[in-house]
C-alpha cells in the first residue's frame, strides 16, 4: 500500500491540473480533475481518444455525485447505492450539469464508486475523478507500472504506485434508466 503522503501528493498534483496514473481494481487508470478542461483534453490526447466518446467519473462514496441526483427517483439512487462501492458503473442522465469534455456526445455520464482503498482515499481528498484505462488507443490496458512507463514515459505528471485490486475484468456498465447491460464485467 502506498503511503497517505503519496496519495496527498497526488491530490495536490490533480488540483494543479495534473494527469496521473494509478492502480485500480483491475487495471491501471489515467485520471484528472473532471472540471479542468486542459487536463481532460491532455488525457484524451495521451489516449488518442475522441472527446465525443465520454469518460467515466469515479468517487469514494455516492454523496460525491449528489449534485447529479437532485431530480432522480429514489429507487434509482437505491439501485446504484446497493452496488457500490464495487465494480459497477452506471450510465445516468447528466442533465447538462457536467462539461461536454466529460460527457462527450451523450446525454448520460458513467459513474462508479470505487472499492480500491487508495483510489477511494484520493477521491476523498479531491472529489470525483476522471478514470479511464491506462493505455493508448488500440493497445491493451496497463496491468503493471512498467507497462504504464512504457506507454507514457515522461508524459504523465505523476505515477501513483500501488497494487491492483485483484479483479480480472473491468466493471460492468449498465444504463440506470433501463437496466440494460452496456458492457459486461
UniProtKB/Swiss-Prot annotation:
The keyword Ligase does not apply. Its main location: cytoplasm. Pfam families: Sua5_yciO_yrdC. InterPro entries: DHBP_synth_RibB-like_a/b_dom, Sua5-like_dom, TC-AMP_synthase, TC-AMP_synthase_SUA5. Its EC number is 2.7.7.87. Residues 4-185 form the YrdC-like domain. One of its GO terms (cellular component) is cytoplasm. GO terms for biological process: regulation of translational fidelity; tRNA threonylcarbamoyladenosine modification. It catalyses: L-threonine + hydrogencarbonate + ATP = L-threonylcarbamoyladenylate + diphosphate + H2O. PROSITE patterns: YRDC. It is found in: Cytoplasm. Keywords: ATP-binding, Cytoplasm, Nucleotide-binding, Nucleotidyltransferase, Transferase, tRNA processing. One of its GO terms (molecular function) is tRNA binding. Belongs to the SUA5 family. TsaC subfamily. Required for the formation of a threonylcarbamoyl group on adenosine at position 37 (t(6)A37) in tRNAs that read codons beginning with adenine. Catalyzes the conversion of L-threonine, HCO(3)(-)/CO(2) and ATP to give threonylcarbamoyl-AMP (TC-AMP) as the acyladenylate intermediate, with the release of diphosphate. This is Threonylcarbamoyl-AMP synthase. It comes from Pseudomonas putida (strain GB-1).
Amino acid at each position: 500500500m502506498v503511503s497517505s503522503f503519496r496519495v496527498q501528493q497526488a491530490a495536490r498534483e490533480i488540483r494543479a491540473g495534473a494527469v496521473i496514473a494509478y492502480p485500480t481494481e483491475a487495471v491501471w487508470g489515467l485520471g484528472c480533475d473532471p472540471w479542468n478542461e486542459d487536463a481532460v483534453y491532455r488525457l484524451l490526447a495521451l489516449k488518442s481518444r475522441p472527446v465525443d466518446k465520454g469518460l467515466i467519473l469515479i468517487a469514494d462514496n455516492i454523496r460525491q455525485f449528489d449534485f447529479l441526483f437532485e431530480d432522480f427517483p429514489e429507487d434509482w439512487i437505491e439501485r446504484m447505492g446497493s452496488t457500490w462501492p464495487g465494480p459497477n458503473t452506471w450510465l445516468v442522465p447528466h442533465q447538462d450539469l457536467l462539461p461536454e469534455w466529460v460527457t462527450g456526445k451523450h446525454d448520460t455520464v458513467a459513474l462508479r464508486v470505487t472499492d480500491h482503498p487508495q483510489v477511494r482515499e484520493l477521491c476523498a481528498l479531491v472529489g470525483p475523478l476522471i478514470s479511464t484505462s491506462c493505455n493508448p488507443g488500440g493497445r491493451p490496458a496497463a496491468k503493471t507500472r512498467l507497462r504504464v512507463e512504457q506507454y507514457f514515459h515522461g508524459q504523465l505528471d505523476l505515477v501513483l504506485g500501488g497494487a491492483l485490486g485483484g479483479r480480472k475484468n473491468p466493471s460492468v456498465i449498465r444504463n440506470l434508466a433501463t437496466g440494460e447491460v452496456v458492457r459486461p464485467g
